[in-house]
Each structure stands twice: as C-alpha cells, then as structure tokens.
Swiss-Prot record:
Pathway: Porphyrin-containing compound metabolism; protoporphyrin-IX biosynthesis; coproporphyrinogen-III from 5-aminolevulinate: step 2/4. It is an enzyme of class 2 (transferase). One of its GO terms (molecular function) is hydroxymethylbilane synthase activity. The modification S-(dipyrrolylmethanemethyl)cysteine is found at C241. PROSITE patterns: PORPHOBILINOGEN_DEAM. Binds 1 dipyrromethane group covalently. This is Porphobilinogen deaminase. The porphobilinogen subunits are added to the dipyrromethane group.
Amino acid sequence: MRKIIVGSRRSKLALTQTNWVIERLRQLGAPFEFEVKEIVTKGDKIIDVTLSKVGGKGLFVKEIEHAMLNGEIDMAVHSMKDMPAVLPDGLIIGCVPPREDHHDVLISKNKETFANLPSGAIVGTSSLRRSAQILAKRPDLKIKWIRGNIDTRLAKLQNEDYDAIILAAAGLVRMGWARDVITEYLSTDVCLPAVGQGALAVECRENDEELREWLQKLNDVHTERAVLAERVFLQQMEGGCQVPIAGYAYIDDREDIVLTALVASPDGKEIYKETVSGSNPEEVGTNAAKMLIERGAKALIDRIKEEMNRQ
C-alpha cells in the first residue's frame, strides 16, 4: 500500500484540518497509508510582527511547497486564504472541499456586541483587512495588533489589555470551540472576509495522477468556483498582505457567481466596494477588479505600497 506523507503546520487548527481531510479520504476507501509530517513555516516563526510588515505572499505555505517539490511530502492541507494567487510550477490545488462558515466573528471579554462596544474599546486583530473595516464602521474604537494561533489569541483576550478580538469563524468551528467563545457573527456588511476564508486547499504535485483522482472525490464545485472568482480578483489587484483587500463569492439559485469585493485604506476612511455576478469565475473576478481599479482602488494600493516601502 502506498504511503502518502501529508505536510502540515504545527498549530492545533492546521493539524485538525489535515486530519479531517485524511479521515475523509479514508472514508472514501482511498488505498493509501497516511503519515503527517509537521513543518514550521516562516509565518509561524515571526510572531511579534504584524503580517503586513513581514510582507510577501505564501508566508505559511512556502516551506511546505518546497518539501512537496523535493518529494519529502506528497500533499498538504492549507487554509485557502494563506495560498498565494499563483502556485509554483509542478504543484496544483488537487481539491477544494466544501466551505466552512466564511464570516469573521467578534469575541468580547464582557459579551458586548460590535455595536455595543464602548467608545475607546481595544479590539485585537493582526489583519489590515479587518482593522480597516472595523474603523470604517466604528472610528471610535482602538485597534491593537495581536498575533499567534487561535488558542494564544483567546488567552491574550482574557489576560491582556483587549476588550475584544476578531477571528475567522471557520477555525473556531473546526476546533469545536465556536459555541463556547463567539459573541457575535459579523455580517459581511460590517466585515467582508478575506479571499478564500473558510475554504481549504489541498495541494499536491501536478504529475501525481493517482492521488489527484482521489482528491477530486472531495472537491466541492460550488466552493471551487466561488473561491476561484475571489482569487482571480485578488491576483488582478496585486495587493498581498500589505493592503486591506476583501472578497467573498457565493453561488446563487441560478448557478451564477455573486462576488462582493473591497479595497480600503488602512485607516478605513477610503473604501471601494463592488458586487459583480456572472457564470464564469475568471470573468467575475476580473470584472470586479476592473470596476474597483476604475474607481481609484489601484491608485490607493500603489500609495499604500509606497508608504510601506518608505517605512
């Protein structure tokens, strides 16, 4: 029996996601033995700096992709939002399983909802996308950077100077913690999620036809199409981690893709937002980018990048 070595980051969430995919493949009767190999990525090592300052795409995937290209591992399960818009030659996304909840959530120390947080309340996030949208709706709140995996952030909320933190719902749901800790699910009108949020990407080598055939059985076409539209939009905007960019697509009753896309200034004072629909994921993503660029979003991105480079 062929042994499939699965690369994973060391966090509880990463290992939970990896084991979930392995379990699904076992249930389908995949003729493989599985072994998980833990890999430390650059993003895991740098925990005292915001992701936007570290810069560069693929902070949580590059080392894993190297291991795959070198034949040390055969596949890896990533959070889709960590995936760069373009994959290295020789690697592909073998499948996109059904999407988990796409929302961001607020977890507050005193169980106050977003609208009821007192003026001057300190909200923890390490995401420019989240902080920009939060400040756009509530400029009276204070943003304080917070890094670390989910358990670390939940501990910091209780023990440090935070009134609330914002996390992705999906990770909490996958860990089985959602019911115990979430104060409020934030609507996409308040906080549009990151591109790919809530979805997984199972990556493998392009020439591994046997494994690809089994991975395809886990693929969810609706999630795949929606996420493709989001990722095409992101690629066209050339934002990276240094710019507040958000995008969420779903499939409507007519099987059309409906994508809402957003670009903002870090202080939340400038926001460009468009909703585009259509049947072709690439066209929908491209059209959303075009509309935002025409309205001035590209000029904003260039300005943000210039300011980052000067720091």
